[in-house]
Amino acid sequence: KSKFISKFNEIKQKVKLEDGESVSIEIIEDDVCFCLSQGLVKKSCGGNGCNINDNDYATTAKELGIEKEVLMAIASQESKHASFKAVKQATILFERHKMYRLLIKKGNTKASVDALSKKYPSIVNEDSGGHNDMTSYEKLKIAKSIDYDCAIQSCSWGKFQVMGFHYANLYSSPRELEKAMNMCELQQFKYFVLYLKKTNGMVNALKSKNWEEIATLYNGPKWKEKNPEYANNIKRYYNQFKASK
């Protein structure tokens, strides 16, 4: 309780309000354990996060009626096993075209978003791409200064690279998603599993090992233009995992 009050007072001192003005401040404590609150573990991680183990893959695969190697293959394709870029910094990919669409969806006029696109073409853009001009975290920092929540939703997160705009599947806000993804590999897995369950046709594609359908559902109908080997890569990783049993 004392930590919470101290944190609140620290933030409150940084927020200056005019008379009659109010503000909503979201405080997510540093030592929160999302997995404990969701019933995934029996003991708090103390804010250090939990790792995925083979049993997590096996249990989820059984629940979905699929082979665990299919899940592992997707992880290998999406992030090459790298859940984190650094300590408490999830692997991300910032998508500038998602930022563009989310800003308009939020109610900004097309003219205002186009003006942002002209000023920050690598951050806000109608077209996808632009992944090599600066790092995703450099882009995210600038995007947050434009609109924090839209910025978080414009990234794919963690080991399985699920987009942030699916945050409501498991979290109360984009900021809570960011906290969970940066903290915990098991949260990245849980977020991924809920995405699979809520994506129409995905579980059936996983069951039948329809690699091209998986690629379409995971990356959109134009996946062959961006990564023509995506489906073959998943199949190859799957075969490697099966052979290593």
Q: Model regions: which residues?
A:
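Cell-wall glycan-active module
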Residues: 1-245
